[in-house]
């Protein structure tokens, strides 16, 4: 049974800010393995499992209700467990993980705030809480695995490159909730043909382009509009709106966090124009 959208739980803590890392940062963590824990970053949304009584409710970071899970064993007091909720993404469907919750932390346990305890102690408490609630055998609940920083490069290769995980999360050993957290995400780039523009709305209506209509050549030789790419500078927005014909037909590069089967990028953003590449070479990726 769904919750009324007017209802909001008393969520415990805001989602921590994560530093964005690159390959050099990850290599530094691997060189000092005892200082870091590494966890996989799944293609889901931040979720909080709020357990009270015989049920646990999954809520997003913005206070939106997502699901209710029956607890095999009732909670002794209010507990808040944190994880990623996978629902509706291509990756979740392919992996057979749609509508599942992947837990990685706990901040409230039986009514007691444990956010100030070390990352290692909270991990132990999380495992114990999942077992105590009977969620260790629940088909929708999983605990995110964790490794030392020494495994960073191998995890990037096997999980991110080969299995399509979104990236890796790094947590400093001995840290409290959100202290010294970082992430490294995989970035994909693709080249498209500009087949049109989308006008800005609101205060930008009549003043600039909101996004570029991206096209790819199909096997039958037709150029098909397959998605839209944002991330334009103010100057480019205005110029594309003023003289769209100057841009239509040109090749551009975009980046995103993943590639869908159709050839569209996840969270696409404009990178640059490609004067060196013919439009006919912009084809749907294999």
Q: Residues of each region from the PLM?
A:
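Nucleic-acid 5′ end/cap handling module spanning
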Residues: 3-63, 69, 136-276
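Covalent nucleotidyltransferase
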Residues: 29-135
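Intrinsically disordered terminal and processing segments
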Residues: 280-286
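A short acidic, often aromatic-flanked loop/helix-cap motif at beta-alpha or helix-coil junctions
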Residues: 91, 109, 149-153, 279
């Amino acid at each position: 049974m769904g919750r009324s959208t007017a209802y909001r739980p008393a969520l415990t803590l805001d989602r921590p800010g994560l530093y964005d890392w690159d390959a050099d940062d990850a290599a530094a963590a691997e060189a000092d393995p005892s200082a870091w824990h590494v966890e996989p970053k799944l293609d889901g949304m931040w979720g909080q499992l709020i357990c009270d009584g015989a049920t646990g409710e999954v809520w997003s970071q913005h206070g939106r209700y997502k699901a209710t899970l029956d607890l095999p064993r009732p909670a002794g007091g209010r507990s808040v467990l944190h994880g990623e909720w996978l629902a509706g993404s291509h990756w979740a469907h392919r992996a057979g993980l749609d509508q599942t919750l992947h837990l990685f932390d706990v901040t409230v346990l039986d009514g007691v705030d444990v956010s100030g305890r070390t990352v290692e102690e909270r991990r132990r408490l999380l495992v114990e809480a999942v077992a105590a609630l009977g969620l260790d055998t629940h088909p929708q609940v999983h605990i995110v695995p964790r490794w030392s920083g020494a495994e960073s490069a191998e995890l990037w290769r096997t999980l991110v490159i080969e299995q399509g995980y979104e990236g890796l999360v790094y947590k400093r050993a001995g840290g409290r909730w959100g202290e010294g957290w970082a992430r490294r995400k995989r970035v994909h780039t693709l080249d498209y043909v500009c087949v049109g523009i989308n006008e800005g709305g609101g205060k930008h209506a009549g003043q600039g382009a909101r996004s570029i209509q991206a096209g790819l050549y199909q096997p039958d030789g037709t150029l098909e509009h397959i998605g839209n790419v944002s991330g334009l500078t103010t100057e480019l927005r205005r110029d594309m709106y003023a003289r769209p014909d100057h841009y239509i037909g040109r090749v551009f590069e975009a980046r995103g966090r993943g590639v869908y089967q159709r050839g569209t990028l996840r969270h696409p953003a404009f990178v640059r124009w490609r004067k060196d590449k013919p439009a006919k070479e912009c084809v749907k990726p294999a």
